[in-house]
UniProtKB/Swiss-Prot annotation:
Gene symbol of the encoding locus: S8
Protein name: Clamp protein VP6
Keyword entries, A-Z: Capsid protein, Intermediate capsid protein, Virion
Signal peptide range: none
Keyword Manganese among UniProt keywords: no
Length: 412
């Protein structure tokens, strides 16, 4: 049975007095006469090659998601124990929050004095559970917004690998996706999770959960064509050609053994590179499409999270039973991936060095692009297409080594 409640958190204002979007965003992303739900995926077409591409008002791969999150957070007061309200002359068209519309001329709803970091609980709005089928997409987008809002770095996502082997039905389902890029797989997962109330133990949920783990195992290099998960792995393009691409592959060769114990962890990219990497944004969205259906398996350890994410009911905490959130940087992660490829005999030492040089150059291009776009889009102007960062953030190693070790424990 589908879960009948959810919990969430609205987006941070990053020191500004109001949500960071404008009326043009309402028209371009959600539309005052269209549903704002399940509208996250056009951003994945921004970067299709090895170089970042300027796209006017949405200058990074993550920009549209960031704006959608800030926009939704400004209109979710019913889930914070309040009424259906308006903000900037816009309100919900009906009680099931199907679409946004201009405030009606007669008896307009009260204006909400919007706030950042507002805890949300579907139990506060009884209309949700009474109209679960029609309002289900709200659960998905609130969940994704929350997993981004809890972090001041990259979005948080969950990974797990059980001790039991992959079910036969899941293996059969995965076969249909061989040759499909990560962006398309994430889009499939997002559309599946948001269409109707889903059962947490369905074959499709299992398929997406395994896809997320296989993607992460391949990101670290642990999974490759010489060591697969039941035959599956993601193949990454050469950095000099298109480093922002990963395609599901299958190989009838050596396979990783199940872990000695079930593995579970929350993850996030700690350096700003994630904002302009399809593999990072798509990988996170794919995993979040699972936990939108199943709910979080445990509280997220708040140890490395920002102050506004401390002790958020049903989401974060500390002490016994919490699951850690490992931070990683894609540059040393790529180096670990290339090292594993060499150790597995897939490339030579000279090729490893060249791959590392190419990836470092690619990462520097992203750094320069995002830095320029942050200057060109100051949040003091009232809009946040680029999430704020400091120059030193690009060099943070975080817990990359621990993340790699986790993949090794997942796929023995």
């Amino acid at each position: 049975m589908a879960q009948r409640q959810f919990f969430g958190l609205t987006y941070n204002f990053y020191g500004q007095p109001a949500p960071l979007f404008d009326l043009n965003d309402l028209q371009e992303l959600a539309g005052c006469y269209a549903r704002p739900w399940t509208s996250r995926f056009s951003h994945l077409a921004i970067s299709t090659g090895s170089l970042p591409v300027w796209s006017a008002r949405y200058p990074s791969v993550a920009s549209r998601n960031i704006i959608v999150n800030t926009l939704l957070g400004a209109h979710l007061n019913p889930f914070a124990g309040g009424q259906v309200t308006s903000h900037q002359g816009i309100t919900w068209r009906d009680p099931v929050l199907s679409s946004l519309a201009p405030v009606p001329a007669i008896q307009p709803p009260p204006v909400w004095a919007v706030a950042e970091n507002v805890p949300l609980d579907s139990n506060n709005y009884p209309t949700y559970v009474l109209n679960l089928s029609s309002m289900w997409p709200i659960n998905q987008d609130v969940h994704i917004m929350t997993m981004w809002a809890l972090s001041d770095q990259g979005p948080i996502y969950h990974l797990e690998v059980p001790v039991d082997p992959m079910p036969a039905a899941t293996t059969a389902a995965l076969m249909a996706y061989i040759g499909v890029p990560i962006a398309h797989l994430a889009q499939t997962a997002y559309r599946f999770a948001g269409q109707l109330p889903q059962s947490p133990d369905s074959t499709m949920v299992s398929t997406i959960r395994w896809l997320s783990a296989i993607w992460f195992g391949s990101l670290t290099g642990r999974l490759n064509r010489s060591r697969t998960c039941n035959g599956f792995y993601f193949e990454f393009a050469k950095p000099a050609l298109n480093p922002d691409q990963a395609v599901l592959k299958w190989n009838d060769g050596a396979r990783a053994a199940p872990p000695a114990a079930a593995q579970s962890s929350y993850m996030r990219c700690i350096s700003p590179h994630w904002q302009h990497q399809i593999v990072e944004v798509a990988g996170a969205l794919m995993s979040q499409s699972v936990t939108a259906v199943t709910g979080l398996p445990a509280l997220i350890d708040e140890a490395t999270l920002p102050a506004w994410s401390q002790g958020v009911a049903n989401l974060t905490g500390n002490g016994q039973g919490v699951v850690p959130c490992l931070d990683y940087n894609p540059v040393p992660m790529a180096a670990a991936r290339h090292l594993q490829w060499r150790q597995d005999g897939l490339i030579t030492a000279a090729q490893e060095a060249q791959l590392n040089n190419d990836y470092t150059a690619y990462a520097l291009t992203i750094e320069r692009h995002l830095t320029a776009m942050l200057v060109a889009n100051p949040i003091a102007a009232g809009r946040m297409p680029i999430q704020p960062f400091n120059a030193a953030d690009f060099g943070q190693a975080g817990q990359t080594a621990a993340a790699v070790a986790l993949a090794q424990a997942m796929f023995v």
